């Protein structure tokens, strides 16, 4: 589902692994919906505009081999772009348009998708059957646009559930804690009671938009 913290989770992973979010390489796959988008991944061929610049993905990984690659909304990528990504997953490397071999052996590749987000909330429970049903529907939705050989090279599929109001309270608490140091520097001490957190979460809560 959308708005459940998929991207935020990847940022936290980068922070935990590298102590900052700089090694996070994020590509919005909605920008790679056309056939010619392949050149933006590995670079333009010789004689074409942008040849010297390298690919948006390969050049960043070449310069920062220890990184996390986030491919956001993978379902929007053109099939030719998916073929390039399949080669990366299969061989752990890719040759860019300038003939340089770029290794992905030290990268973590994360792909997010809203596949299966049309599943109604009522079918997503905490029971084993509810969780299993959600996984099966999500995997079926993934199979609608990803070839079997692509899915076979994915180490793990993580299914997110919609956030509850309790989750929103936890998020509000974390965001307020992050705000406190900045307020304290300005001589403001800020405390938030549980009742206030509950009201903040209630005002922000949304089943579909996150």
Question: What role is predicted for each listed range?
Answer:
Residues 1-210:
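AAA+ P-loop NTPase nucleotide-binding core of proteostasis motors
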């Amino acid at each position: 589902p959308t708005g459940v913290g998929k991207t935020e989770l990847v940022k936290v992973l980068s922070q935990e692994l590298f102590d900052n979010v700089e090694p996070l390489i994020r590509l919005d796959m909605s920008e790679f919906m056309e056939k010619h988008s392949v050149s933006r991944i590995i670079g333009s061929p010789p004689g074409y505009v942008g040849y010297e610049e390298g690919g948006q993905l390969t050049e960043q990984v070449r310069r920062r081999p220890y990184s996390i690659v986030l491919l956001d909304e993978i379902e929007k990528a053109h099939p030719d772009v998916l073929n390039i990504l399949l080669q990366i997953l299969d061989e752990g490397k890719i040759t860019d348009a300038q003939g340089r071999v770029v290794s992905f052996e030290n990268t973590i590749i994360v792909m997010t998708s809203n596949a299966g987000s049309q599943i109604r909330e009522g079918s997503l429970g905490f029971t084993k059957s509810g969780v299993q049903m959600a996984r099966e529907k999500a995997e079926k939705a993934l199979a609608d646009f990803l070839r079997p050989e692509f899915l076979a090279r994915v180490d793990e599929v993580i299914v997110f559930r919609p956030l509850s109001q309790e989750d929103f309270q936890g998020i509000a608490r974390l965001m307020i804690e992050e705000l406190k140091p900045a307020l304290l520097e300005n001589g403001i001490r800020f405390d938030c009671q549980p009742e206030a957190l509950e009201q903040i979460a209630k005002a922000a809560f949304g089943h579909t938009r996150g």
